[in-house]
Amino acid sequence: MDIPIRFKIYLFWKNLFSKKGDSPHIKITKEGRGVRSVLFFLPEKKEDAKVINYFVKVENPLSDYEIGLICSEKAKKFYPHVENVSLFTYNDNDLTYFSTIKSASLLNEIKVKNYDAIVDLNTNFCAASSMLFFDLDAPLKIGFDSLINRKIYTITLERKENAFLESYFSKILSLLGVKL
């Protein structure tokens, strides 16, 4: 994953002044009950959106789960059926120079929901999602592997170029304890 140098500098600066404690340890077992609420950060690429629409089932969300979705205004057109879930969007005015979300109202809106898990479905590095995950206190944070994401996410998935996205997404569902 290619990570811009200005974002690396920003994250270094943020780590210096952030008094964030270590994430709580989690244990994944067959006897676990899974999560009840999940926030998915939706990708901006049209190709990924086709698979994501099926995976997240935005037209008919997973019953018994509180599902939240977040995406940019530009990407919202790729996800037309989002009436049944909490949808959070941001635009270019909500981003800082470092492409991170600066809108305090949006961050507070998401924090109030207190999601059990947050999942970054971007297969490429996304500064907005990485820093949003840094600021949220969900016990389970899942995303694709990168040098920076290893420090932010609880679980990272290594993306192989020849593997199908669907296999990664089914792995994410099993980690969440979601039964289809």
Predicted regions and their residues:
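Short N-terminal or domain-adjacent regulatory/targeting segments
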Residues: 2-37, 46-47
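Structural motif
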Residues: 37, 41-45, 72-73, 117-119, 121-123
